[in-house]
Amino acid sequence: MVILMYEIVRYEGGVYKNNIFKEWIEDIGGFVIQEHVMQLDVYMTLAIPQNELENIKEEAKKYKGKIIETPLAGTEIAVVAPSLSRHHLPHTACDISEYLRRFGAKPNMIGLARGVGRDIAQLREKERRLIEEHDLAVYVMGNFEDCIKNKTHLFDVDIPVVVTGGPEKIDIPYPYVGNLGRRSHRLRHGEEIRALRKMVEVITELINERRRELSYDPPIVPPVVVKDEIEKQVEEVYSILSPMPIVTQLDGLRVKLDYDKYADKIREVKVKNYTLGDIADIKRSEMKNYILIKIKPKSEVEFEMHKDKA
C-alpha cells in the first residue's frame, strides 16, 4: 500500500471563484484544514499531495491568489516558561509564540509550577507528559548564563528541544538561540528579529529531521486524512468554540472534545479500510481532558494484521 505524503501550505486570495478553487483542491486529493473569510479576502490552510505543489501554485494565480509555504505547518509546539509570573512570561514568550504562528505552527504556552529558582527548579511528571504531547518544545529562559546551565534538567523531555535565552552563546547539550532573554518591551528591534529568525531556522531543521525519520516508517494514514474523516463523522466537532477544534501533529492529532464523553465515538471513526481505534493510540490528554490521537506507523499496523490472521 502506497502512503500519500501531504504538504501543508497557506493560500491568500480573494472570494472570486473561491468555491471553484476549493473543488479543484478536493479533485487532486487535498483538504482545506482551516478557512478565514474577511470581507473580500480569503485565507486558507491547505493540505495537498506533495507532488501537486507546483500545480497548485499555478492554479492559485488564476484566481489572483498566492501560495505561501509554511515550514512549521502541521506541528504543535510547546512554548515553555519557568513560571506564569510577570518575572518570566511576557514579553519574550508571547512574541516567540506569535512568531511561530506566522510560520504555520500551533503554539501552546506552558508555565511551569516549580520552574523558579536556580537550585530548586523542578519539572513535575504531569508537566513532562503535557510537554511530550507536542512535536517540539521551546524553553524561554532568562538573561543569566549560570541560571540556564543549572536548569538544564528542566529540558529533559522525550521530544526535540530548543532553548532560548539572553546570552549570545552557552555551552549546553541542547540547541540554543541567544539574544532572546528577558525584555521589558516587545521584540521589534533588528537584532531581536534576527534572533527570532535564527530560532525558526533551528526549529525548522529539527522538525524536518523528525519528518525524515517518520518518512522511513510513516503513520499508516496521514493526520490530515484522519482530521477530515473525524469532521465528517463526528458532528460534535462543529460545536467546539476553539479556533482550531482539531490540531494536527506530525504523527497524530489533538481533538478538543471531552475524553470521557467522546473517546469511544472517536475510536469508531472509519478511516479508509480501518477503524481509528485499530490504527491509533487514543489517550486522555493532559490538556483540559482533550482527546490525544497518536497514529501507529505502517509497519506496526501490518504486523498486528498478520498476527491476527495467524
From Swiss-Prot:
Pfam families tied to this protein: MCR_C
**Which NCBIfam families has this protein been placed in?**
methan_mark_7
State what protein this is by name: Uncharacterized protein MJ0094
User: Origin organism of this chain?
Assistant: Methanocaldococcus jannaschii (strain ATCC 43067 / DSM 2661 / JAL-1 / JCM 10045 / NBRC 100440) (Methanococcus jannaschii)
